[in-house]
């Protein structure tokens, strides 16, 4: 086995664990498609969280294994909570609570990322809807 295989296998184990904890079907690491989410370790050892729609790259986030696990978990939590909770303040609070069960660092990161998104898209007033994480946003 190569280092890349070891890294892919370790990532698959963690994706499976998170999926089970979230109550969703796991996804295969390394299976690349041109329509949907792709999680893979590239030949250079970099970890990718990429999304394709109809053959066109929507995004390709590159980071550590922890980054990939955070993106995977946060995306699932955000999607699932949005389906169940209409009130945005309650939605952001529930996202924080669920992510905290996996990692308090991920929960805080999600709040910081959401605040940055609000600023980027000209909605800084929406930061007030986010839970207090004990640090300035």
Residue ranges and their predicted role:
Residues 25-27, 32-34, 63-66, 80-93:
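Generic structural signal for short, solvent-exposed loop/turn connectors between secondary structure elements
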Residues 31-57:
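Short aromatic-glycine-(Arg/Gly/Cys) micro-motifs in beta-strand/loop hairpins
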Residues 3-4, 8, 81-137:
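Intrinsically disordered, low-complexity, charge-dense segments enriched in Lys/Arg
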Residues 18-25, 79, 106, 125:
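Short secondary-structure junctions and interdomain/linker hinges
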Residues 1-39:
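N-terminal "first-domain core" detector
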Residues 14, 18, 71, 117:
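Residues that form generic nucleotide/phosphate-binding pockets
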Residues 47-51, 55-80:
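Aromatic- and glycine-enriched beta-alpha-beta binding-site module
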């Amino acid at each position: 086995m190569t280092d890349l295989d070891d890294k892919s296998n370790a990532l698959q184990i963690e994706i499976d664990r998170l999926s089970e904890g979230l109550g969703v079907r796991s996804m295969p690491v390394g299976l690349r498609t041109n329509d949907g989410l792709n999680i893979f370790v590239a030949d250079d050892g970099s970890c990718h969280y990429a999304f394709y729609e109809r053959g066109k790259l929507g995004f390709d986030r590159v980071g550590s294994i922890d980054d990939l696990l955070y993106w995977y978990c946060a995306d699932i939590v955000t999607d699932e909570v949005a389906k169940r909770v209409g009130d945005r303040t309650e939605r952001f609070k529930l996202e924080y609570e669920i992510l905290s069960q996996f990692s308090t660092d991920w929960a805080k990161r999600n709040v910081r990322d959401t605040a940055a998104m609000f600023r980027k898209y000209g909605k800084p007033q929406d930061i007030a809807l986010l839970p207090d994480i004990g640090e300035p946003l």
